[in-house]
Structures are given as structure tokens and as C-alpha cells.
Amino acid sequence: MIIVFMTVFLLGSLGGGNSSNSTTSICSTSNVLCSGTSLTYNSSNASTQAATTEFQNLNYSSAASSQNPLEVINAHKAYGYGLTGSGETIAILDAGFSTSHDELDSKTITQYGTQTAATGVNATADHGLIVSSVAAGEDDGTGMQGVAPGVSLHWASYNQRNGNTYYPTHWANATDNASSAVVQNNSWGIDYQIDTLQSDINSNSWTNAYGIAQKFHSSGYTANETSANAYITALDNFQDHGVVVYALSNTSSYTDADFQAALPVLFSQLEEAWITAVNVEITGSSGNETYTRKSAPCGSTGKYCLGADGYQIVGAGYDRSATNLYWQGVSGTSFVAPQISGAVALLAEAFPNHNPEQLTDRLLASADNTFFSHDAAVTFGNGVKHGYDDEFGHGILDIYAALQPITSS
């Protein structure tokens, strides 16, 4: 295994708006949270997996007390049920891909349009490859592994237009093409707060679609209102079969979510199966943790926001003469989002009759929200209430809890 040491903060979005002490209702289509998986749990298998070098290698924090991100989200306990994400597909809209790395070389990968290839120049140039390895790195006894090592992947590059005049047209087409995916991972975005964009829209009497098109266009992504609407429609249609996961900004000084992660604020039809990702470094011994936000807060997206530890981790890197290069010390919400996407794939395998909204509900309603005070709560369709706040959303992803019957917290 070739190791390259590097710390880099990568794409994401913002967060922070104020919430009152209230209850928000999100209606699930049935009372599916009342029961857990019917699969048999093998604690020995879970413990064995957690002890492997490959499982431990995702973590690379300089903090001596840093916890393993995979163990924090109880990924090993999902493996105790025999879950790997087999039969599921994660769509990744990103840039900097390579199929030759050891972590992905045995995986089924569908590619849409022209890809921006990984170059190995730095971790940013290999961004899509790193994200893919965190979500889906193979459990093959070497290197590291991802959350859902058995999944297939669908790749598309957000910084290509694939012959279209406007970028959002390509994003819409790529989203539509991922029709077999159970989740779409978005570890990219433009740093511009949703509340600021809302102010721009109101002061200029723009439509919401025109407003986001203006921001895309001014940020170098050629767009118009029609193409922006096409992208929103594609994201809405995707939720018929999959969950949309969006990384928040890495700008920790932000006071609200960035507009891309917070698109459901402008387009309420997107709220059905949408999760935003906040980066939380977790240190200390089990039961005595310290939680430090390393990104923008959840803000206006708090009621559909989840956290995980994406601080100083390991991910696959590109090298033209080797297939086992790994970047060490990469950080960002970009690497929280694929942990959530991997969790969606594991749950889809465990609950094959769940629709995307139900998978989303299960993850949000089971997150660990015990380490902060709640500003409000979401009431799910079966009466389960789960508290959240503007900083951490619903709290830390817990895959094991999501596999169990869920009660209010």
C-alpha cells in the first residue's frame, strides 16, 4: 500500500438558520419504523470486522483520542447482519475518477458522459475517487474499505457539460441516467448561503429557478432558468427510487446552509428523500466523546441533516504506475456524505420494500442526538419524534440503530 500524506479540505456547503421550539411533521407512507430488520445478527462477525486493519485504516487523525469513523457509525454492526450493499447502486456526481484502483477494480461501475479523470496531482484532483472509496471501497483484505463494500457505482462528472450548452442540463441528464441507483451522492457545491440567495431572489423579484441559475452562471457553470428547472425536476424524479445526499460547505464560519445543499428550502418537492451532511470530529473514549463541528452547521436544513466524522481520513488516490496509492489526512463534508450514502445502500439491502422516503426517515429518526440540546423535533408518520438543532441536525449517523425498531428520542 503506497501512502501519501496530505491534509486537504474539500467541497461542501454551509448551515445555521434559527429554529424555534416547534415540531415539524414528515409523513411516512406507513408505520415502517415500528419494526427492524428480519436478518439475524452475528456479534462475532461484527467484532471480527471491526478489528481488521482494513476497517481501521479509514481513520487517520493526528488526535490520539480520535475514534474510527466507521466504528462511530456502527458500520461493523451492519456487517454483523451480513450487509454489504450487494445488489444496490450508489450514484456519485463528482470529478476525478479512476477505475484502476485496488479499492474499486472488482466493482461494477456505470459511467455517464465524459468523465474528469483522476490525475494524482493532489487529493482535490482525485476527489471522486476518494469519495467513491469512502462509500464503496472493497473489503478485499488490503488497504481500506468503504461503508458499503458490496455496492455498484454510477459515475458522472459535474464539471462537464457532455455536449450541452448548460451545466444543469448535464446534471439533470446524469441524474436521470442513474435510474437504478438507490442514492445519489453530491460531495460538491458552490459556497453561497441559502439565506443570502433568498435575499437576492426577493430583492430582484426573481423566481427561485432563475435565482439558482444566476448563481450557477456567475460561479462559472453556464446556466439559465430552463436548465435549472430541468435539474430540479430530475432531482425530484430521482426521489421516486433513491435518496439525494448533499454535502454541506466546509466553511465553518457560515451561519446557514449553502444553497445547493438547501435546495429543498427553495423547492419543497425535494424534501421527501433528501439528506445533508455535516462534518463532526469525534474524539475521546466511548461514552466520553467530544464533538467538534468542522464544517458549516446544518442551518436551514437541520430537519433533514445528519453528521459523521469526515476529519482526517484515508481515501484511494490515483497513480499511473500503481493501483494502491492512498491519500491520508483528507478532511471535509465531502467524506461525510459518502458515509451516509453507503448507509442508505446498506439499509436498502436490509429493507428491500422500503421506498426512499422511508429509508430517509429511518436514518434521521435513529441518529444519535444525545450530545446537544434540541431546537425542534420532526414527527414521523408513525408518531416517532426525533429532536434536531441548527448545528448538528439530527445528530450522528447510527446504522445499527437504523436497523432496529425506532422510538422517539
Model regions and ranges:
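Classical Sec-dependent N-terminal signal peptides that target proteins to the secretory pathway
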Residues: 1-19
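Substrate-binding/access-modulating region of protease and related hydrolase catalytic domains
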Residues: 17, 21, 28, 84, ...
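Subtilisin-like serine protease catalytic core
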Residues: 26-57, 62-67, 76-112, 116-166, ...
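C-terminal subdomain of the subtilisin-like protease fold in secreted/lumenal serine endopeptidases
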Residues: 45, 67, 181-185, 276, ...
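Extracytoplasmic/secreted envelope proteins and their assembly/folding machinery
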Residues: 75-76, 128, 132-135, 168-171, ...
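Extracellular S/T/G-rich loop segment that most often corresponds to the catalytic His/Ser-adjacent loop
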Residues: 94, 263-345, 349, 353
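Residues immediately C-terminal
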Residues: 98, 253, 369
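Short, small-residue-rich loop/turn micro-motifs
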Residues: 108, 148-151, 188-190, 308-310, ...
